[in-house]
Amino acid sequence: MTIKDLYQKARIKWSSLYEGDVIHILIGTATCGRAAGSMAVLEEFKRCISNMDVPVSISEVGCMGLCSYEPLVIIIKPGNVAICYHHINEQTVPQLVERYIKNDDPCLELALGTVVGGGGEPVHIPELELFSYQQRLLMRNCGYNSPLEIDHYIACGGYSGLARALRLNPAEIIGEVEKSCLRGRGGAGYPAADKLRHCYMSPGDTKYVVCNADEGDPGAFMDRLLLESDPHSVLEGMAIAGYAIGAERGFIYVREEYPLAIHRLQTALAQAVEKGVLGSDVLGSGYKFDIEIVRGAGAFISGEETATIAAIEGRRSWPRHRPPYPSQCGLWGRPTLVNNVKTLAFFPLIISKGGDWFASIGNGKDTGTVLFALAGKLVNTGLVEVPAGTKLSTIIFDIGGGIRSGKQFKAVQIGGPSGGCLPQSLLDTPVDFDSLRQAGAIMGSGGIIVMDEDNCMVDTARYFLDFCSKESCGKCTPCRDGIHQMLGILEDFTTGQGDLSELDRLERMAEDMKQTSLCGLGKMAPNPVLTTLRYFRDEYIAHLVEKRCPARVCKELTAYYILPQKCYRGCDHCVLACPAEAITGDDNGLKVIDQAKCTKCGSCELVCPPEYNAVVRLSPVSLVPPERRSKTSL
């Protein structure tokens, strides 16, 4: 069956969503939606419509990236524009059913926007401020199409890129990718066309394509969202890559911690084979391409391409020296193309729309769009897709909505645990590979963590280095021992130990480690240390010289103190919450924290009524008046 035949049949099914007589309810059930309660919402909708006379269908869709607005529900009612509702729960479902599905009140107070522009209220979703700066290529289908329905993907142009690729020769496909100037989105930014060409030129009858979906960065979930929301875009990209290099087999290496992504990939694979877009005769062309899913154990190091190959082969995930590169000697000694999920998902768009079209997007240095996972102290967290070269300030303040609770911005950590921490003065940095590298950060897999005045940069560097120390494979000495020694120094700093000479030693160790480590983990792990030393050196000095943590985070340098003038209510909230029984009352009923007993868990600060706000953190600890350091000192 040709792609034209598949498209015509799929379009009929797709059109019924917006043009038929059935009321359609689309519920976002990606992992983020499920964490917010979307499955309970799904069951409540089923219960509420079970006795209705009018036809109603319920479908699961992926995530459109608005994770902080979940659960999201789209209701498509014949004769009305499709409306997306946010923060839906079991209590609001009956309202939507009674007021809108059964009647004509669209419940605008619950609406985020319309899916298809219709003018008036509510606003069209792409016109929302957090969307207006975005350009959605990879996420074009996410949250609107069902990942469990291949016809939805085909009806929106899916597999047309593969159909065009099959009419081209490998050199022409590689030429289109070269014109696009696409750089790999796995972190290193290597030109995608060069990888394809090297693998195509490598001699051998057996070659492989590997999709590296081992996403291990804290706070990163771009690959997971794509696999859960639009798995066919990745499968199509793998088939195009396989045809370009002469491979008949592909592997998706995905961590076991992504069960929903695995399930939806399995469903998509089965449907693709059934439709003939994968398998023994792809779209009737005679080309054969099969894909297998390999589950990983979740080690961070497995994301390094040679470690990924070792894991697929059933060996320990240890990186190896390069050359030879995987394009020369990869999986089972055969030429292998290893690409990230996002890189592969771009191939269908580049082939169907042309490399020049793709190259026109971006800032000239880098092309196309970049996918980022926004996390941390932001109003809007989730996934965003922006043209390469967009400023960090636009992503954080215009799309992310700025810092929560009126706090002050302090830093943004970009690039995962091996990325750098950049200060406010660098918020105009464009997000392209070279600009970020010049600033001391990396694009990485696309994680962005925003920090405010309550984050300690010394402790932040310690946290990321601690993560890398646990995830290091231990194969090379610079990484294994270097991280351990640097971590020890940082742990001393967070307790006020050490002197200023240690800063230079720490910097030298970090630079040596970058130069001598075997793989990217060891080479990049010092980045948080080097950038915090470069941009936040004053915080290190405060810890070492003043024995003070400016953010009042480091426990050994911080004390909890109850302000007598604010504790006039004399309640027992803090007394009851303290696990160490360190809080007692004086003769006037005012509370005192015994500093010797206090474990600095912060429970007292959490439970103190906000109208009193009597519990504060002080640093250095000498700020606590001597007469109020324990009940006996009164």
Language model segments and positions:
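Ferredoxin-type iron-sulfur electron-transfer modules in oxidoreductases and energy-metabolism complexes
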Residues: T2-V22, S38-E60, K77-E109, S160-V177, ...
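Gly-rich Lys/Arg/Thr-decorated short loops/hinges at beta-loop-alpha junctions or inter-strand turns
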Residues: L26, N145-S160, C211-D223, P326-L331, ...
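Conserved phosphate/anionic-ligand binding catalytic regions in large, soluble enzymes, centered on
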Residues: T29-G37, G158, V177-C199, G298-A310, ...
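Iron-sulfur cluster-binding cysteine motifs and their immediate structural context
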Residues: P71-V73, P478-H484, D572-V592, S603-V621
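Flexible inter-domain linker/hinge segments
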Residues: A111-K179, G333, N339-G354
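Hydrophobic alpha-helical positions that pack around
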Residues: L130-Q134, I262-A388, G400
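Accessory "access/gating" subregions that flank catalytic or transport cores
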Residues: L162-P203, F358-S360, K365, A373, ...
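Short amphipathic, charge-patterned alpha-helical segments
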Residues: G237-A241, G389-R404
